[in-house]
Amino acid sequence: MTNHPLDLYAYAERRNIDVDWIPMRRATSLSVPLGDRYAIALDPWKLGSLAQETVCLAHELGHCETGSFYNQYAALDVRQRHENRADKWAIQHLIPVEELDEAVADGCEDIPALSEHFCVTED
């Protein structure tokens, strides 16, 4: 997997995960289980850059790939645990340790340079 949104959309398609662009009132992105499949919604009008689209889509794929879902009644610690799992999946796929080591060895040593190199947001 590379760090371009088109590659992430292709990954989702191979995994039978529906990805749709939908305007939403509050959320920028969300994912839901649908029986034996998953669906992701992204609000393209809230995505300010390719890096943000990449990070949001990877995060939602992380929910799908780890089965980390919760409902509105879940306790905050449960929600955070599921969000952390999705973040961990996204980070491991967007910034593999070996590639991070190579980037640092090649001179990408600060957060802005690394985020640009990996096409991810700084946060």
Where are the language model's segments positioned?
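Active-site hotspot residues in diverse enzymes, especially metal/ion-binding acidic/histidine motifs
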Residues: M1-D123
